[in-house]
Amino acid sequence: RSRKSRKRSSAGGNAVIVDGYSKQWLDQGFCWVYPKEIIRHPPGCRPGATVQIRSEDGRDLGAGIWDEGWIAVRRFRQDHGPIDKAVIAFRLDKAIALRRELIGEQTTAFRWVNAENDGLPGIRIDAYAQFLVLTLDSPSLSGLVEPICDLLEERLEPRGIFQAWRPDPRDKLDTSKLEHRLARGRAPAGDVRVTERNIACLVRPGAGKDIGIFPDMRDNRA
């Protein structure tokens, strides 16, 4: 939505109120709100909660997921409303359509979803042949795992979906509690053979975020 179409709201008690600096960046399409940009937020707000974002003058700036780390809010929509399966499906379908247009059959290891670049901040989905790895930047996004996995099974029919974590070191999380796991389907019997421009290699999707090949580094291997 354009800035002109955003409505003023007099009720700011249930919203995150951001300063003018944050508003400028959000108006340009950025997905993040940092702690120092927040004037006030709902009391008792916990990581994973959906919050509305508003400027000091009451303008709606969208909705996001609250966190208590280096990033305070990841914005998932620029209008007022829930962050539900329909929102995720819309972004995911656009990302899938783009990759199907650009990536040829000779490449079976690539990134389906690249976080905020596809409107899904903090979420990455990599393909390794018939297996997928869903990587989250923060535990605050855990509530999206099930709807994302449902959509991936409907759209891509993978043999298995692994969930991995890649938290920012500035968040100072206890990473011992962040387990890489098989979220859906079954695990491969051994290494998985993938191709990149017809060059084959073996990977281990169940090993987590660093499994032997980085899909976003393909140009460096060209």
Each PLM stretch: what is its role?
Residues 129-142:
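A short interface-forming secondary-structure element
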Residues 48, 210, 215-222:
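Conserved alpha-helix/loop element of class I SAM-dependent methyltransferases that forms part
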Residues 1-129:
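Non-catalytic accessory regions of SAM-dependent methyltransferases
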Residues 84-91, 140-148:
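Short amphipathic alpha-helical segments
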